[in-house]
Structure formats: C-alpha cells, structure tokens
Swiss-Prot record:
The keyword Translocase applies. It is an enzyme of class 7 (translocase). The gene is araG. This is Arabinose import ATP-binding protein AraG. It comes from Rhizobium etli (strain ATCC 51251 / DSM 11541 / JCM 21823 / NBRC 15573 / CFN 42). The keyword Cell inner membrane applies. Keywords: ATP-binding, Cell inner membrane, Cell membrane, Membrane, Nucleotide-binding, Repeat, Sugar transport, Translocase, Transport. The complex is composed of two ATP-binding proteins (AraG), two transmembrane proteins (AraH) and a solute-binding protein (AraF).
C-alpha cells in the first residue's frame, strides 16, 4: 500500500493553471525524485503538501489517511517537513533557537538556553554537521544555513520530508553529509521527496521518479533504474535537447575589462585578470574560494582595499554599485531572492527599477513607456507569465533570472556583465535559454564574467576559465586546454598558486 498519495491535485492562479489533476503514489521508506522545468508545478505541489497553499481540488493521503490540514502548522504536526530552496531560518536567532523554534524546552515557562544549546550541539555532532549552535544564523554561509534546515527535519522525526534543490548551495563535503542523512531517514521509513535538476543526484539517490510538465503529470517511473537520462529530459521539456551548452565561437575584440591587484576584506591576496570584448570568462572554484567576494568587490558592493579597474581603457573606481552601473558594468548576484529581485513588486517594476530615469521627465514617470519596455523584454527573454503585473515572487527561478537579465538589458550602454551562479536551481530547458541570452550579449561585444560552482557549465559556455582556490588564482585555462580533471585539481585547497593573469 502506498504511504503517500496525490489524487487529482489541482491548483490555479489568475491566468495560470499551476497543477492539473496530478496523481501519483510513493511507497514508505523511499526516496522519490520530482523533476520538471521551472514552472512545471513542482514548487506548487510542495506548497500544497506543506499546507502553505490550499489545493483547488483533489486529495492527499498519508498512510491511508486523508490530510485536511489548512496551514503549515497543521502539516508540521502531521509529520510533514518541507525544506524550501529559499531558506526559512530566522537570521537574527542562533542555530539552536532556529532548530527549537516553536518547541523550546522549558520548565515553568522558563526557557533553559544552556539545555537548548547542549542538546543541539550533541545532535549536530551526531549527524556530522560542524556548526556552533550558539552562532547567529546571519553569520553563516548559505551552504551552512542549508545544512541547518536539513538538521531540523532530522530532529523532528518527520514522516514525509520534501527537499527542494537541497544541494544548490552545498559544498561536496556538505552534499555527502546530506546524502548520508537521507539514507538514515530512508532506513527509518520516512518518505523523501527529492526535487532537483541534477540528474546525477536523481539517479544516485532516488528509487522512483515523477516528472511534471506544464502543471500536468508527464511521467511516473516506479523504478528509476528502468529509465534513462535522455528519456527524462525529453519528458521534462517535451522535445529533444542534444546540446544544452551550445558553445558558439565568435570573434573577440580588445580588452574591455582589466583588473589589477584587486583585494578586499574577504579577498586578501590581490588578483588580476582581463576580459575581452565578446569574451565569456568563467570563474570556477569550490565554496569559499573567493569567487563571489571578487564579484562584489569588482561591482562596488563591498569596499576594496586596493586595486585598479578599467573599462575600455578608462579607469573606474566602483566604490558603490551606482558608479559601476554608470561605467557600464552590471551584476546578477548569487542570491536571487535577497540580492536580485525586489520582492512584493511586479515583473514590470523589477525590469524598470534600474532605468527609470530613462522613462521619466522632470521626475514624472511615463507608465506607458515603462510598460512597453517590460512587455518587450518579457517577449524577448521568453518569460513565462500571464501578465507583466504579476508579483515576481510567483515566478520560477529561471524566469526570475530572466527578469534580472532584462533589467540590465534595459540599461543603456552595458559593457560588462558579471553573473554569479547564472542557472542555480534552473531546469535544463531554461538553462539553454539563459545561455542563448549570454551568447547574444557576447556577440554584441559585451564582456561577460560567469561565476559558477558547476564545472560542466563553465566548461560548456566559457571561452576561458579562471580557477580560484582559497582566495587565490590557481589556474587560467584557455578553451582548447579544458580538462575536467586538471581544473578540479587546481580548485582543491592544497594548492598554493597565485598571481596575475
């Protein structure tokens, strides 16, 4: 008998049918994969399961009992825990307080912090997570925060655990800890719904698989061993994708961006590099290698200690992002939710926010011009939405990334694009569309810096790769010399290479 059952679950929003009569079952003690393009309905299904949103129709059964909860709290008490891609921790509370939030150990109404911290410390050590429980969550890396979310599910003894892109911010070591935790939960009899775009992980961890497309059930595989990667990709996108990367050779111009001796608070060893007109330069390294820190220094988001930056031979001193933008340099940040999109605002507003000075006269906005621009970029970038007025938080990760790119494409005179983790949490179909946008920009002479923790991505789309390790430049590899083993070796922490490029 199935332990978890979705029966004709449907959910609609204004102009969009997110789920249409989705039905499938999952056995007890099974890791079940959930795949589909961004916008396929995966996140909506998880929200319905978690009680965050109510279904318009259909039923959910756990161990034969219909679930009629109407809130996240009800689902929580039913043994359902969801770990979202957008983490739900409270930044200003400690690790221990977050893990015990809503169920603090108390006596006579008094919370015993010492007991709280020591209990959490023992549990974290038991499951192999090396984090001080008295540390505030705000001081932790994204990867460490993800591990704390996962630890919460383990401590709650949940019956059903949904993990949404759980390794997107984890190092290799942290991912291995996660995989061992999943094995422990599986052995305990829990159902794990594993949402991921990483086929390697799906085939390694999952026993069965469901594929959604356009809110409908595209395929259900009770035994994942009986399917293939090619079949799954075809089921996801409804078409064959022979080459996701599609690298395109193009003529490169003179140096457009030159960086000499750049350093800052979290990038102690000065680094130097250049990017030519039309070139796509990749930065690869493990988590903590200093890639994102370099990008923030370059863009003026963080104060630099020293260093020279020139664009088309003109010296630029980006001590804040406004200066960088004025000089023609823009950044698509690593964390789309907190640093990229403006939550609670429409797609139109998010596209126009950096260029509104072009759509105003004497400080008065021109709504029709702004709306026309939004419609143009929604069509050009193939943003899937019923309306430009839709709140951007309701878009999938891939469509949010397109809107951020649209924002900068609307900025006149863009010369340098720095894009950090361009396709994190984005499905294979949307990845291909993002790469098309980057190739088009490069063909127009824009110098592009791509920062990615996915080696196949930088090898697939970049003309050159700079490998970073512990805040230093460890290697500079031209496309004819791309070799996965040598690039990974250069990224390992026991290397000490540094210098100019």
């Amino acid at each position: 008998m199935a332990f978890l059952e979705f029966n004709n679950v449907s959910k609609g929003y204004p102009g969009v049918q997110a789920l249409a009569n989705v039905s499938f079952t999952v056995e007890k003690g099974v890791v079940h994969g959930l795949m589909g393009e961004n916008g396929a309905g995966k996140s909506t299904l998880i929200r319905v399961l978690s009680g965050d949103q109510a279904a318009d129709g259909g039923n959910i059964f756990i161990d034969g009992e219909e679930q009629k909860y109407t809130s996240v709290r009800d689902a929580f008490h039913a043994g359902i825990v969801v770990i979202h891609q957008e983490l739900q921790l409270v930044p200003e509370l400690t690790v221990a307080e977050n893990l015990w939030l809503g169920r603090f150990p108390a006596k006579g109404g008094i919370i015993h912090l010492k007991t709280l911290i020591e209990t959490v410390r023992a549990k974290l050590e038991e499951i192999g997570i090396d984090v001080d429980p008295s540390t505030k969550v705000s001081s932790l890396s994204i990867g460490a925060r993800q591990m704390i979310e996962i630890a919460k599910a383990v401590m709650l003894d949940a019956r059903v655990i949904a993990l949404d892109e759980p390794t997107s911010s984890l190092s290799s070591r942290e991912s291995e800890i996660l995989f061992s935790l999943i094995a422990r939960l599986k052995a305990r009899g829990a159902v794990i719904l594993y949402v991921s775009h990483r086929l390697d992980e799906i085939f390694r961890l999952c026993d069965s698989l469901t594929v959604l497309r356009d809110g409908k059930l595209a395929a259900h595989h009770p035994k994942i061993a009986e399917t293939t990667r090619e079949q799954i990709i075809s089921e996801m996108v409804g078409r064959e994708i022979s080459n996701v990367w599609g690298w395109r050779e193009r003529a490169l111009g003179d140096n457009r961006l030159e960086v000499k001796g750049l350093s800052g608070p979290r990038l102690h060893t000065p680094i130097s590099f250049s990017v030519r007109q039309g070139e796509i330069l990749g930065f690869f390294g493990l988590i903590g290698a200093g890639r994102s820190e370099m990008a923030r220094l370059l863009y003026g988001a963080d104060a630099r200690h020293r260093g020279e930056v020139t664009i088309d031979g003109v010296a630029v001193s980006p001590n804040n992002p406004k200066v960088a933008i004025k000089a023609g340099m823009v950044l698509c940040p690593e964390d789309r939710k907190f640093d990229g999109i403006v939550q609670g605002r429409s797609i139109e507003e998010n596209i126009a926010i950096s260029s509104r000075r072009h759509f105003s006269r004497f400080g008065i906005l021109k709504p029709k011009t702004e709306a026309a621009q939004a419609d143009r970029f929604i069509a050009k970038l193939r943003v899937r939405t019923p309306s430009r007025r839709q709140d951007i938080v309701n878009l999938s990760g891939g469509n949010q990334q397109k809107v951020i790119l649209g924002r900068w494409l609307s900025e006149q005179g863009i010369k340098v694009l720095v894009i950090d983790e361009p396709t994190r949490g984005i499905d294979v179909g949307a990845k291909s569309e993002i790469y098309d946008i980057l190739y088009e920009l490069a063909a127009g002479g824009v110098a592009i810096v791509v920062i990615s923790s996915e080696l196949p991505e930088v090898m697939g789309i970049c003309d050159r790769i700079i490998v970073m390790c512990q805040g230093r430049v460890a290697a500079n590899v031209a496309r004819p010399d791309f070799d996965e083993r040598s690039i990974l070796t250069a990224a390992l922490p026991d290397k000490n290479a540094a210098g100019s490029i």
